[in-house]
From Swiss-Prot:
It catalyses: a ubiquinone + NADH + 5 H(+)(in) = a ubiquinol + NAD(+) + 4 H(+)(out). Residues 1-20 form a transit peptide. Its cofactor is FMN; [4Fe-4S] cluster. GO terms for molecular function: 4 iron, 4 sulfur cluster binding; FMN binding; metal ion binding; NAD binding; NADH dehydrogenase (ubiquinone) activity. It comes from Mus musculus (Mouse). This is NADH dehydrogenase [ubiquinone] flavoprotein 1, mitochondrial.
Amino acid sequence: MLAARHFLGGLVPVRVSVRFSSGTTAPKKTSFGSLKDEDRIFTNLYGRHDWRLKGALRRGDWYKTKEILLKGPDWILGEMKTSGLRGRGGAGFPTGLKWSFMNKPSDGRPKYLVVNADEGEPGTCKDREIMRHDPHKLVEGCLVGGRAMGARAAYIYIRGEFYNEASNLQVAIREAYEAGLIGKNACGSDYDFDVFVVRGAGAYICGEETALIESIEGKQGKPRLKPPFPADVGVFGCPTTVANVETVAVSPTICRRGGTWFAGFGRERNSGTKLFNISGHVNHPCTVEEEMSVPLKELIEKHAGGVTGGWDNLLAVIPGGSSTPLIPKSVCETVLMDFDALVQAQTGLGTAAVIVMDRSTDIVKAIARLIEFYKHESCGQCTPCREGVDWMNKVMARFVKGDARPAEIDSLWEISKQIEGHTICALGDGAAWPVQGLIRHFRPELEDRMQRFAQQHRAWQAAS
């Protein structure tokens, strides 16, 4: 029986199985969180165990990898699609679908997998924990993902500042080569696959997939116009898929345990487990693996020891890294941490980097500092981003002092809207959204600050 289901804004036919014998369907899951230890994928997140090959083998990495490879690309892609895994780098595009774009007849050009380890989003530090404490998960994930795409090699593009992470990753790659797990006849599967590490130089813009490809090729890291998309013309002009570290690292476990197992966590279209970074005004900042759709309040109170001064001292939360709009305490009470719930709350999951701000925070200054970051990191290729973000930075600097008129709040909103969606890459969007979140939820704070400044200025003029 065929039915229609909403999927990424459209309708696609899906097969629905109906059990006529009982007349009832299985109840939908309504509570999320409290992930059991046996369901965790990243079992060495805190570096308590040996991260080298010997320790990785004890924790189940590289288990039956040969069997996975021999089942072939179609089987791997099928499991990834069944799992419902969506990209963990921020965009949330269905991974199985994205990887399938590469699974087409060869035209003679080699195919490549590029792993985006250029983690530079303020507040985000999940990928570096994988590379530092569980590097073999990433190396094995490259092999499995590469097999699904028919790729010849993987390039792991790692942020230049991640010296220790790059060192551990390089050691893990060497161990895998020496053990015959990658390279010629990887895992005895008659599949040849190489893994290379490329060091970045600290540019945030190189986290954008086409700028990253340009950097690998030795060019200036500036985003390309699309189309052509990387799956057609990527690194060195060859078909390429760019994937996030976490996305790649979970793929072997999904293949071993089954896509259905992974899909059993979280809400529909938001399945699986996820690494969350919790920082800011919490008692115990941490990186934790939890079930998707876990309530934000539970995530903070259970894993981070709660907000400093108690939950009532909470002012706002940035739920998905610096490029996602903040949400006030009233929204934080009930919101779930997944793609769809946060979009409904007028923000986004992003990289799932939760930045907590209590009532001691100067919220205007905090957002102004983020805009300064984006102004510094803009490549300057697109006029709306180059000029607009610089303009927003100057206006926000005056807003911090209150040296502005209330009408300028609407002007700033309009500037952000002129940047959003009018640039080659999403850096402009990432700069616009924090400003929009501030105006949406803290407009009275901006107006009060301007009023206080005006009163002080009049008093100063009268006194002088």
